[in-house]
Amino acid sequence: MRKVKPKLNLTSQTARIVNLSHDGRGIARVNGKATFIQGALPGEMVEFQYTRVKKDFDEGKLLSIIEPSTLRVEPKCPHYQMCGGCSLQHMSAEEQIRFKQSHLLDLLSRYGHTEPQSMLSPLTSHHWNYRNKARLSTRFVEKKQSTMVGFRERNNPRFITEINQCPILNSKIDTDIVHLRKLIDTMEDKQCIAQIEVAAGDNEVALIFRNLTPLTEQDELKIRKFAEQFQYKVFLQPGGLDSVFCFYPSDAHAYLSYELPDYQITFQFHPNDFTQVNAELNRKMVTQAIQLMELKNSDIVLDLFCGLGNFSLPMAKHCSRVIGVEGNKNMVERAYMNAKSNHITNVDFYAANLDDVMEVRNLVNTSFSKVLIDPPRSGALEIVKQIDSIDPERIVYVSCNPITLARDTDILVNQKGYVLITAGVMDMFPHTAHVESIALFQKG
């Protein structure tokens, strides 16, 4: 028998916000049931309207704030209420950090069944114009006869938020979004460009145009003029990821670069490569990871999910040898290229299935005193399950998902005999609910 959906009560309601959810929404208790309200802060009395009724929880739209929190600030971005690029601009920067640290500790306790012996001071950076990588959606709207360029709407991802600026994006893109819109407005095929990937190095910014159909000669000319006038490297992507090529300048090499000045290392990367979005925070993160490793000249270090060598190369300057293992062959090639260009010879890189520790052990037949793990959001479950085959004395775990960090912590601490010495948050994505963290485990 078909279930009847509960009817929404569209009359306005009032409630006191008692907490924040993991994604930064305010939580109210209405008739004993949790109601999630975007934009509300703990302690506030708010007026809201129900938008969804579920069995275990409800969702509501914030209508007004009757009693505001002292933690509330005015969002800097004029598009904040609609745009899905941010979710915490209404919260003070200091409170954002406290929220993320509390969330990390809660998950470590609830799912990791432990707590760190000490907490690291949070790593922070500039809160604005920090984001060096982003994917912007584009769409020409016939009714308006204009192009929309921006992030998806927060409450309706089918739609694009029409933005004129973005204070979290790299400052050059923040300024030039309007010009990007004008470019597509003038093209012969205004529906051709589906999205624009932004990738910024220390000195250059690249744009990858995802073109659904071949560009006309006139449109190619317009893109070249745009790139020349506003000083961009432009790449085109007519098909899959392997179809990306440098369109302008036609004689340019395909790489951008960023530096780790403390280690006198320069990394080259393709705009499609994975790199950290926040360059300032990345520099601080690398330094903190190396400090936590307490590297000695005799150490042989295993760097899992090593990417293009972001941790491997600076670590190599402080120990005997580093072995980096990565699942993506292209990134392994990039890591070798960066090692060579920086004259670092005590590193080796391998491509392997990182869900199969025995494959890694067969490739790398040596023992390791220390391991650095920097996995994707899915975490490092298979690695921590089989950590006995590596048996390091010290593990530094860099996480972009506190839920999988907590899960893996439970295994390391409660099954494998490690102690969670310290942990802390890294504010890689200010004004969002994303929690990046770092943790140190020592063999008990």
Curated annotation (Swiss-Prot):
* Catalytic activities: uridine(1939) in 23S rRNA + S-adenosyl-L-methionine = 5-methyluridine(1939) in 23S rRNA + S-adenosyl-L-homocysteine + H(+)
Superkingdom is Bacteria
Give a single Pfam family match.
Answer: TRAM
Q: Specify the signal sequence span.
A: none
- Is Chloroplast among this UniProt entry's keywords? no
Q: Which residues does S-adenosyl-L-methionine bind?
A: Q276, F305, N310, E326, N353, D374
Q: Which GO terms describe its molecular function?
A: 4 iron, 4 sulfur cluster binding; iron ion binding; RNA binding; rRNA (uridine-C5-)-methyltransferase activity
* Residues forming the catalytic site: C400
Query: Entry's CDD domains?
Result: AdoMet_MTases
Q: Which family does it belong to?
A: Belongs to the class I-like SAM-binding methyltransferase superfamily. RNA M5U methyltransferase family. RlmD subfamily.
The job of this chain, per UniProt, is described as: Catalyzes the formation of 5-methyl-uridine at position 1939 (m5U1939) in 23S rRNA.
Q: What is this protein called?
A: 23S rRNA (uracil(1939)-C(5))-methyltransferase RlmD
Query: What gene name is given for the protein in this entry?
Result: rlmD
